[in-house]
């Protein structure tokens, strides 16, 4: 019963409002509330406890304690500084190693490029997907001719040979001359399978050559960044391209 009376009394009590900053003190900023004071007080208390712990640690320090890090640290102006260790690899050696890496990758890329050229010459790469397809445009005078247009009839060849861009004989040539090479279905399938296998190999080699080219560019970019010339990054590094930097122009002697 008492709880019910307390709730009823709260519903009728005056609404509590925090005091705001007076008008003549607006230039001093917002009036500090209790929550602001609490944050400031907690921060001050935390710092005091940290200083107290440091003082206690300094008083309890053992003058005979030893750490292995002390052998490579020296005290200079009250600050601990790690001694400089001897370089196992000089910058010139590192630059030479990276140059050899670039040369090796470039050698592999050139080898892949030569294999690609050899495969292209063997396959007579005229209808390869990676190559830009040529367009054959036909012109007509009326819409009726466009609707009745048939590519095989216009080119005077068999419908099966329309998609070819090379070795597309006419019907009269097929009727007059004897077909050379394999004519049975099994032999044709075997030749088509071998040809497709070579095209797949060529596609893989082209992709590998592109990846090697990108890797060589990235290593070369890292080698160029070793120069102390002032530089600005223009483009970030991506999977398919290295980062691009603009170097400060320097007059050559």
UniProtKB/Swiss-Prot annotation:
Family matches, as Pfam families: Utp11 (PF03998)
InterPro entries for this protein: SSU_processome_Utp11 (IPR007144)
Modified residues (Phosphothreonine): 90
A molecular function (GO) term: RNA binding
Phosphoserine: residues carrying this PTM: 241
Subcellular location: Nucleus, Nucleolus
Region (Disordered): 1-26
One Gene Ontology cellular component: nucleolus
Covalent cross-link site, Glycyl lysine isopeptide (Lys-Gly) (interchain with G-Cter in SUMO2): 74, 83, 86, 103, 120, 143-144, 180, 211, 218, 235-236, 246
Alphabetically ordered keywords of this record: Isopeptide bond, Nucleus, Phosphoprotein, rRNA processing, Ubl conjugation
Record GO biological process: nervous system development; positive regulation of apoptotic process; ribosomal small subunit biogenesis; rRNA processing
Summary of the function given for this chain in its UniProt record: Part of the small subunit (SSU) processome, first precursor of the small eukaryotic ribosomal subunit. During the assembly of the SSU processome in the nucleolus, many ribosome biogenesis factors, an RNA chaperone and ribosomal proteins associate with the nascent pre-rRNA and work in concert to generate RNA folding, modifications, rearrangements and cleavage as well as targeted degradation of pre-ribosomal RNA by the RNA exosome. Involved in nucleolar processing of pre-18S ribosomal RNA.
UniProt similarity note: Belongs to the UTP11 family.
Assembly and binders: Part of the small subunit (SSU) processome, composed of more than 70 proteins and the RNA chaperone small nucleolar RNA (snoRNA) U3.
Protein's UniProt name: Probable U3 small nucleolar RNA-associated protein 11
Source species of the chain: Homo sapiens (Human)
């Amino acid at each position: 019963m008492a709880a019910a009376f307390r709730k009823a009394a709260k519903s009728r009590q005056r609404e509590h409002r925090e005091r705001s900053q007076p008008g003549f003190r607006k230039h001093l900023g917002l009036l500090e509330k209790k929550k602001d004071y609490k944050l400031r007080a907690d921060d001050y208390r935390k710092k005091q406890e940290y200083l107290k712990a440091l003082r206690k640690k300094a008083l309890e320090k053992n003058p005979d304690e030893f750490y292995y890090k002390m052998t490579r640290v020296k005290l200079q102006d009250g600050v601990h500084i790690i001694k400089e260790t001897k370089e196992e690899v000089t910058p010139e050696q590192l630059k030479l190693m990276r140059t050899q890496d670039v040369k090796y990758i470039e050698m592999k890329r050139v080898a892949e490029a030569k294999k690609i050229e050899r495969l292209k010459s063997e396959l007579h790469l005229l209808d390869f997907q990676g190559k830009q397809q040529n367009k054959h445009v036909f012109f007509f005078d009326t819409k009726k001719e466009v609707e009745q247009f048939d590519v095989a009839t216009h080119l005077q060849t068999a419908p099966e040979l329309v998609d070819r861009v090379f070795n597309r004989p006419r019907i009269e040539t097929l009727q007059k001359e004897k077909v050379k090479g394999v004519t049975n279905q099994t032999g044709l399938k075997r030749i088509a399978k071998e040809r497709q296998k070579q095209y797949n190999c060529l596609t893989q080699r082209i992709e590998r050559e592109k990846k090697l080219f990108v890797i060589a560019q990235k290593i070369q970019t890292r080698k160029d960044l070793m120069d102390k010339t002032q530089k600005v990054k223009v483009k970030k590094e991506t999977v398919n391209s290295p980062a691009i930097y603009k170097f400060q122009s320097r007059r050559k002697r």
